[in-house]
């Protein structure tokens, strides 16, 4: 879906596809973290990125249409548009996970607490004017050493910086997305905002049966959905059918895990007073499986032998690390 208001401006197809890849991957990461930590601020960032993906998708389609005049040129861009559409689908599914938090869908707190033990923390903090971070580079700050946290993305007004490096200089008003261990969050937050970090008080009753099984499934679904996205982009970079088949296998496994998690919810519903506390888990299962489906849509361009335009390879190579399959 395109934004209601937009203004077309010429964009490079390679840059657009690179940005769509980076944005969709970040959204998946943030969406799961928002759900696990019940963090509305991070969930809102996911929806902001979803709006951005709509705009990128619009510009991608416009640029593709304007760059073709002949049938053979249009055929060459079919793969580009398929990859872009799949990236948009990944973003939409990540947005659905974020809405679990914003719409207060039911995921029991004891399940979230158990999930936190298996995941690193993601925190959002805005750089204040008086912050020691303002005006300094990430290399100077050495946040990974000082706090045990590292910045994975920065929102600067409406622009995003993905995978910032040591030379990236922070500014007042930058919204930092950082990953690390729970112990480092208070110091990182205070360094950025100059305010004391106040963790949320958590109260919950232990009512869930076979909780460990649900945690295992959700952690596996999260890891497999993220892996399938990374593998899918690697498959098209190397035009590698072996990697593409791995994505297909992950997609089939995700289908089974979705049904298994749904079955767990139905069984657990017998033992809870309010079944609404489990509603979000069903939503999570469907959204996670949708991410895997979309990743398969990317890999399918290789399996169907759709001609891969050089734009795709350049876009993926311009992004982050890639994955190869070892025999």
Label the predicted regions.
Residues 1-327:
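Cytosolic, long alpha-helical scaffolding segments
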